[in-house]
Amino acid sequence: MSIRWDPKQFEAKWAAKWEEDQLYKTGPADHRPKSYILDFFPYPSGDGLSVGHCRNYVPTDVLSRYYRMRGYNVLHPMGWDAFGLPAENAAIKLKTNPAKLIAQFSANYKRQFRLIGISFDWNRELNSSHPEYYRWTQWIFLQLYHSWYDTRVNRAQPISLLESELARNGTSEIPGVAALSAKEWNSMRPGQRRDFLSRFRLAYRAVSTVNWDPVEKTVLANEEVIEGRGWRSGALVEKKKLNQWFFRITAYADRLLADLAMIDWPEHIKLMQRNWIGRSEGAEVRFHTDAGDLCIFTTRPDTLWGATFMVLSPEHPFVERLATPAYKAQVDAYVTEAKRHSDKERSAEGREKTGVFIGAYATNSVYCERIPIWVADYVLMGYGTGAIMAVPAHDQRDFEFARKFGLPVRVVIKAGQGAKPLDAAEMEAAWTGEGVMIDSGPFDGTSTPVAVKKVTAWLEETGRGKQAVNYKLRDWGISRQRYWGTPIPIVYTPDGEVPVSPDDLPVRLPDVSHYEPTNSGESPLATIAEFVNVALPDGTVGHRETDTMGTFACSSWYFLRFTDPRNSLAAFDTKEVAYWLPVDMYVGGAEHAVMHLLYARFWTKALHDLGHLPFLEPFQRLRNQGMILAPDGKEKMSKSKGNVITPDEVVEEWGADALRTYEMFISDFEQATPWNTNGLAGTHRWLRRAWEILLEPACRPTPDATTDQADRNLRRWTHKTIRKVSQDIEGFRFNTVISSLMEFTNALYDSQKHVSEEAFTEATEALLLMLAPVAPFMAEEVWDRKHRTYSIHQQAWPAYDEALAADEEITLVLQVNGKVRGRLTMPANLSEQEARSVALQSEAVRRHLDGHTPKKVIYVPGKLVNVVV
């Protein structure tokens, strides 16, 4: 058999063999330690995989192979996030059904995954558009529909418990709810009760101003609007009022924030979630108007005495109620124009302020003065109450607005006790810092941190307001006016909404040839009579909800289904999820930080509260891959720019193992980097050298003293490499995994004629086993040619000897008073006393002591000595 390095001779052979033998099939829950390694649920596009996608999948495959060799029970599955706009739009363009496209596209993805040696367990393959899957998405919807969040116990409870409590006690013991007696509840008609319970359900329907994508002709969730544009179409989003279904994610805001401390995620992802949830503490203050009390939220109640006007969001219901006849025309025109702009545009820093007076006034009760009410688009309905008290002296946006429209500025905070108060007429910008209250009645002289608490308490005592917490987070809107999605399991009758019985799931998506989006805002399903019209068990004729769920509903629980994908009796087996979850390593793009990652955490917590899951967080460890850029390093790879490189063309020229190792070697995993063919050639050369060392016999020297020393050196290198590669795989440092293996290969090459057969065999055996996760095809072929028992991927990972892997020398940083003054290399086994003594005698330290006696010598073992004088 030729020993020439030619990947085409064996890569396809082993891919077929592994698949035939189901080598990577995952066993059930058992006594072994587990490792659940998961990639983000991909949508299988018609373009197939690019080398950029491989940057995600190769490292998780290496990790999976490594843990299998470590004796772990590894779950490394794959499936398809098949519902949604991309598949539907592509199918409309090609005049076919989306299901056919998904089958075609996913088959190509599977071919490419096999081509590059990804060890998925295909027995667990999922497709979110299959009824066997979305039946359970609908079941979870019903779990949320039949639940409410009880703040007294800080968890979700069955809605039936709330109904029982209302029948006994009304709302008397439920905090923050309008008074309702048991008698009033018991006298309500069924429809009235349903409407009342909608205020509590975790899945509910409500009229809402929504984000409308005019290109996709559907509603978008807040998280799907990026800088005012649809996240897929790029179209400027419009505002519409529609009846929509929502999940009450806001009930979990505090827990979503607090539990970030439980998980090992990149700090920037945690920060994005914190900012998106946007928790802020302050006060809710009431201002009296002719249409009733107008509530505002402020984080600075200490500036209440400086409020000189009020501003309403164009969407605020009080705009229509309060606008006087003399001003109504200009108000209506302004509101219409404002709704054409996205929230991002409206709140952009530096944008010129616009607004109109609505002809009405509110009373600032702290000084019993009427102040004018304006409508302006810089106030957003999605934050706070959609109304603000404008304090131009201490808020920059309010200051700019006041200066433009000639509104009064009243200074109520000065910089400090001895500071001179600002002159409102001379101010060029608002004073937004902390300070001391002035012209604020009984609170004059109170400093800001204390004042905020004192004023809030005073508002509560006097009935003017109360302490409040506000969130930027809004409930998750799931309704989509498109065909290709999970049907919402609700039927409408003359008496109101009726949830579909779990026994009648799934509500199947009809197989139709025409499903183009409508211009009316209705879902295409509304035009399919056989889907819409349904007879209920009691003989009532109803009509189905025709909106479908947004695709993020499907991806909010797929990690649970992978543990038990063929279960026809339940969404998942409780024993299996208890064993496998949470996911140990989750890998995908940072762009999903405030969509999929937030939604999945919410669903997990809700299902935990309802007794279905024994854990609170779905993904224990998260990593985001860096982007592969075009070779020029400036552009993303994209089909439109014609710069996409596919794994197919790379494997054809260089082989799958060269592609895999280059994907890892190219840079740190989380760093964006350009594609470089020269680097690919380098990994190819390295693999060829490793191949030759592993398969070509070399002459060994006659053992002598020189050989013994060479053996000791090689053994140390071998065990150090095993330790380093093991630690770096687990630490997701794949570039240093490859560089360590390259260095070890070169060391083997240089030492092969100077070491004994025993030492060389130990080293090459270790190299081959360490190559198995990163270059699985070559490793399997070499293993086979050595006539070893199939398969190398079922062998044990090499162990290292701690003594041999230990460093013989260390480099200590030498500091004097915390400043680095030098470095010193010394034996690793030096004691602390010896290290201190050597450091004090070194020229670098003595020079900076300048004759002074050290006060203290701080020793950090193996790292530094700091001399304090």
Question: Across the structure, where does each feature detected by a protein language model lie?
Answer:
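Conserved oxyanion/phosphate-binding beta-strand-loop segments in alpha/beta enzyme cores
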Residues: 1-38, 68-77, 100-107, 265, ...
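Helix-rich, typically C-terminal accessory recognition domains appended to large enzymatic cores
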Residues: 152, 199, 204-211, 467-496, ...
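Catalytic alpha/beta core of large soluble enzyme barrels
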Residues: 60, 73, 316-416, 424-431, ...
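Basic, alpha-helical terminal appendages of large translation-related enzymes
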Residues: 1-34, 313, 325-328, 388, ...
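N-terminal catalytic cores of NTP/NDP-binding nucleotidyl/phosphoryl-transfer enzymes
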Residues: 26-102, 126-137, 298-299, 364-401, ...
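Residue patterns forming the tRNA-binding/recognition surfaces of aminoacyl-tRNA synthetases
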Residues: 4, 13, 17-21, 94-294, ...
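Long, charged, mostly alpha-helical binding arms that flank functional sites
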Residues: 2-5, 96, 279-284, 414-417, ...
